[in-house]
């Protein structure tokens, strides 16, 4: 009877799990997110910014990837364990060869975690050119109570391309190893004179998923006149903790209510 019950549970879990498939054609586009300079960036399917990816616990994230760049590329799901699937982790020449120009690769990642993550290129300094996007792993049995779910990205932005920035950083003319200073910051993928707007309805509780997708910069986040409650840090649910502001270093994620 016990084995029949366990088998039934396994079949039930298998029945609800599914493949969630995205098609990413990675290529060059032009964008001007801070309103200061239009330049070549790396987008997906002919647009920038790349759209967020959403998948649920026990599903499998599938990314059908085509490289339309003139250099290799890879994709890395930041913060994911990749237990048994390290060959899908993405670091160039560490866990995989690069996807060559004109080449294709299918990433298949079983989802055994929940929370807030992000995905980015992991070849050279490529993600500085914009190939980065939120990756949200939903929990069907979400322990925290809220009415709406909002993703808010924070990132620095350079007017020079990643290849030139990396060349200058590694140059003998930079003996102190000074890192390139960004030209500005983007909140919600916009910056400069354009402000990202969040619309709230009084009486509703909002989960804001903060993701620092920068190359260099730390962000201090606060909402004037409001306290916030931290409920998740780097994909790990926490007991609610009231704070006045949140500090996020590069690659960190925090959810607040």
Task: Give each language-model segment a name.
Residues 251:
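Ligand-binding face of N-terminal immunoglobulin V-set domains in extracellular IgSF glycoproteins
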């Amino acid at each position: 009877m016990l084995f029949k019950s366990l088998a039934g549970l396994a079949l039930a879990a298998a029945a609800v799990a599914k493949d969630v498939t995205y098609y990413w054609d990675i290529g060059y586009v032009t964008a001007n997110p801070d309103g200061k300079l239009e330049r070549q960036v790396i987008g997906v399917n002919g647009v920038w910014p790349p759209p967020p990816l959403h998948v649920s616990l026990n599903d499998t994230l599938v990314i059908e990837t085509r490289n339309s760049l003139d250099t290799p590329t890879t994709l890395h799901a930041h913060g994911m364990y990749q237990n048994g699937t390290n060959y899908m982790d993405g670091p160039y020449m560490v866990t995989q060869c690069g996807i060559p120009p004109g080449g294709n690769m299918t990433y298949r990642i079983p989802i055994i975690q929940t929370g807030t993550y992000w995905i980015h290129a992991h070849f050279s300094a490529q993600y500085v050119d914009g190939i980065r996007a939120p990756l949200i792993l939903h929990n069907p049995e979400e322990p925290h109570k809220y009415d709406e779910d909002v993703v808010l990205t924070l990132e620095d932005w350079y007017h020079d391309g990643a290849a030139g920035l990396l060349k200058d950083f590694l140059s003998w003319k930079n003996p102190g190893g000074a890192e390139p200073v960004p030209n500005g910051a983007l909140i919600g993928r916009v910056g400069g004179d354009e402000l990202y707007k969040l619309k709230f309805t009084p009486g509703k509780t909002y989960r804001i998923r903060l993701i620092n997708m920068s190359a260099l910069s730390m962000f201090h986040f606060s909402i004037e006149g409001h306290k916030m409650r931290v409920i998740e840090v780097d994909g790990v649910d926490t007991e609610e903790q009231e704070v006045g502001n949140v500090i996020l270093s590069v690659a960190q994620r925090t959810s607040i209510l």
